[in-house]
Regions:
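A conserved short alpha-helix in the C-terminal lobe
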Residues: 105-117
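Regulatory extensions appended to serine/threonine kinase catalytic cores
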Residues: 190-194, 198-215
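Conserved end of the kinase activation segment
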Residues: 91-104
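Catalytic-loop of the protein kinase fold
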Residues: 38, 42-59
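Conserved C-lobe activation region of Hanks-type protein kinase-like domains
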Residues: 114-168
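A conserved short helix/loop substructure at the end of the activation segment
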Residues: 124, 165-171, 177-188
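Conserved structural core of kinase catalytic domains
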Residues: 1-30, 76
Length: 215
């Protein structure tokens, strides 16, 4: 048995119920476990296509399962389904079964999943005055600041605090993906999150999942 990511990790009261002892380090371990699984699928030329938290079952931070694998894209069989928040701008609104996904499309979904594990359950394009997610994705209207660069629509409260506590090298890459459309390979995320885990272990950064103030 295990817990569906969407209804355990991504809902704060349920996160505290199912994983009461988890800290940032556990969610980074979980991210690394998922990324290593995705990387090995990519090496076998399999694209998940509909990567999303409803299709990931968490047994522990080191053991996860993908479900709905019948929609995986294998060779010339397209993945016929998708999820708005995990669909990159260039294929928003397209008929999923009418084309083949590329790894570049999947790298967008991977970055979204990483973001939503770092800020548990918060999609990257949700913002104050929240307009339509698909529209925000198409415009790449990303609301989390990088230095002075901001659209001043960052969601209030805990989300701002979590973002402020992330190391610059992670914020920089997330900003690059969601504002500048520069995606990185799965192996690069593995390197960045391994570095983050190391920095957490040194006590340089907060291990709280929901810090209550800015860094």
């Amino acid at each position: 048995a295990g817990h569906q990511m969407q209804t355990s990790l991504f809902i704060k009261p349920l996160l505290k119920k199912y994983f009461p002892k988890w800290t940032k380090k556990d969610t980074i371990d979980l991210s690394l476990t998922i990324l290593q699984n995705i990387e090995s699928l990519h090496k076998s030329n399999v694209i998940i296509g509909d990567l999303n938290p409803f299709n990931i079952i968490i047994k522990s931070s080191k053991t996860v399962f993908f479900v709905d694998t019948d929609s995986f894209q294998i060779e010339h069989y397209p993945c016929p389904v998708g999820t708005v928040n995990f669909t990159p701008p260039e294929i928003q609104g397209k008929d999923y079964k009418s084309f083949l996904r590329t790894k570049k499309h999947e790298y967008y979904a991977v970055a979204t999943l990483v973001f939503m594990i770092l800020l548990p359950g918060k999609p990257p394009y949700s913002q104050q005055g929240g307009t339509n997610p698909a529209a925000n994705i198409k415009k790449m209207d990303f609301s989390y600041p990088l230095g002075e660069k901001t659209n001043k629509k960052t969601p209030d409260g805990t989300w701002r605090f979590i973002w402020s506590h992330l190391p610059f090298y992670l914020k920089d890459k997330l900003y690059d993906v969601f504002k500048n459309n520069k995606r990185i390979e799965v192996s690069h995320w593995i390197d960045l999150l391994t570095r983050y885990k190391h920095d957490l272990s040194k006590g340089h950064l907060t291990n709280d999942l929901f810090p209550s103030d800015f860094k």
